[in-house]
Amino acid sequence: MDNLTKVREYLKSYSRLDQAVGEIDEIEAQRAEKSNYELFQEDGVEEHTKPSYFQAADDSDTESEPEIEDNQGLYAQDPEAEQVEGFIQGPLDDYADEEVDVVFTSDWKPPELESDEHGKTLRLTSPEGLSGEQKSQWLSTIKAVVQSAKYWNLAECTFEASGEGVIMKERQITPDVYKVTPVMNTHPSQSEAVSDVWSLSKTSMTFQPKKASLQPLTISLDELFSSRGEFISVGGDGRMSHKEAILLGLRYKKLYNQARVKYSL
């Protein structure tokens, strides 16, 4: 390392360094290029024949060429393929295409209602091929149908398929008509006079709170239903008691669970 350092220091102080480098480049440019073979001959290296394993490879290539030419007769020639250099046409299929029936199995099962000592169980199998989002939508639909049973009788609903899905309609219930024969010079009792609970639609009913910090709940049928027709359409009946009609309205407005927790219904 010390000698190399000294050489570097000397070259830095050598005043004719650039001139020497230029002369070396000029000599190198004028030197004639020679192949490795010529360099070996200059050094007295004799040229030898190819090794035996190279000759064996050459002999095998020569012998295999006629074989390839003979086998080419077994391949069907494609006129377009002849225009591509180095392309060899492969053997063509000598059988005709056959139609194969493909049957896709399905694991879907129709709804099954089971009964045991714990009660009834309904099993629904979801359709195949649903994405995660589609399966979530399917579950939400089933849940909505089940929850709607609180507000109407599903067994009496009509079922209609549409382009967008399914339409379920409630069967309209015709209210009973009570004939009242008036009696002259008599004053009927309140129970006899009230033949339809809707006649009490403006009468409020009060429910006491379960906690002293809450105010009593006072509500009427008019606040829960816009009309008698709406009351009837969600399962109301003129023969209901006033309290039953109020509770039906709370369920219809989805207030029943909140009221049940806070008030004595």
Swiss-Prot record:
Cell compartment(s), UniProt: Virion; Host cytoplasm
Modified residue annotations for Phosphothreonine: 62
Ranges for region Interaction with the Nucleoprotein-RNA and template-binding: 245-265
One GO term describing the cellular component: host cell cytoplasm
GO MF entries: RNA folding chaperone; RNA-directed RNA polymerase activity
Variant or mutagenesis effect after changing residue 62 to A: No effect on viral mRNAs levels and infectivity
Stretches with biased composition (Acidic residues): 58-70
Pfam families per record: Phosphoprotein (PF00922)
Keyword Hydrolase: no
Chain segments carrying region Disordered: 35-77
Phosphotyrosine: residues bearing it: 14
Residue segments, region Interaction with the L polymerase: 49-105
Chain intervals for the UniProt region annotation (Interaction with N(0)): 1-60
Annotated region (Oligomerization), positions in chain: 109-170
Function: Nonenzymatic cofactor regulating the function and conformation of the RNA polymerase and part of the transcription and replication complex. Binds the viral ribonucleocapsid and positions the L polymerase on the template. Acts as a chaperone for newly synthesized free N protein, so-called N(0). Plays a role in virion assembly by acting as a bridge between N and L.
Record text on subunit structure and interactions: Homodimer. Interacts with the L polymerase; the association of P and L forms the polymerase complex and positions P optimally for encapsidation of newly synthesized genomes with the nucleoprotein. Interacts (via N-terminus) with N(0). Interacts (via C-terminus) with N in ribonucleocapsid (via C-terminus); this interaction allows to package the L polymerase in the virion and positions the polymerase on the template, since P acts as a bridge between N and L.
Entry's free-text remark on domains: The N-terminus is disordered and is involved in binding N(0). The region of interaction with the L polymerase is necessary for transcription. The hinge region is highly variable. The central domain is involved in oligomerization. The C-terminus is basic and essential for binding the N-RNA template.
Similarity field: Belongs to the vesiculovirus protein P family.
Name under which the protein is recorded: Phosphoprotein
Taxonomic source organism: Vesicular stomatitis Indiana virus (strain San Juan)
